[in-house]
Amino acid sequence: GNIIESLGGEVVVFGTPAEEGGDNGSAKASFVNEGLFDNIDAALMFHPANKNSVTQKTQTVEPVDIEFFGKTAHAAGSPEKGINALHALIHFYNTLHSHQTGKFKNLNIHGVITDGGKAPNVIPDYAKARFYIRGATSNESREAVNTIKDILTGIDKAFNTTSKLTYFQNRVDHFVLTPEFDKLFSNIYEDYTGLTIEKGQIKPGGSTDAANVSHVTP
């Protein structure tokens, strides 16, 4: 209170309880999209960890659902009348895996099949998978999504299916680092607590929606 009174300004607290799940997952992105940080000059985010460190590089996330629509039929009695959505999805899954050493070699793509049909004697007319597409930069992961859309188009032609790609949560950007702020915070934190903050960068493995904030507010 005394600091604010002497320097002026305002402290704003954004609460984000359970912000990682549900349709509004990575909810800080929603805050950014709604312009809640437009008049904020600087932001601090604290996250529990096993050590104290400066802001780290993080990966982007494109959280997408992939759906295939086909035509049901009896798998033994009249398989020729069906269009197997699961076959198309499995082919898509394997295609993504094959590209991990090629065009997607700099990306981290992982996912699960969430719906592959209900009974083995029925050709599934619907199949669904959920993926996280992670990259070093937002441009890189977004370009991967465009490539995946092209792959889906090709699979639809081959299997006579219809596919759909949708985002099931907010997308997550890469972190824009501000070394000057990290240095200032480290000096104040170490002087005040007597603890040491690690200054180096580690290989990015995770993601955070605080990165979305860093694109509009340091």
At which residue positions do the language-model features occur?
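Acidic/histidine-rich catalytic neighborhood of metal-dependent amide-processing enzymes
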Residues: G1-K57
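Long, contiguous binding/interaction regions
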Residues: T196-I197
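Midchain, well-structured core segments that form catalytic/ion-binding scaffolds
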Residues: D38-K183, N187-Y189, I202-A211
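Glycine-rich, small-residue loops and helix-cap segments
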Residues: S214
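Substrate-recognition/cap regions that form aromatic- and gly/pro-loop-enriched pockets
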Residues: T217-P218
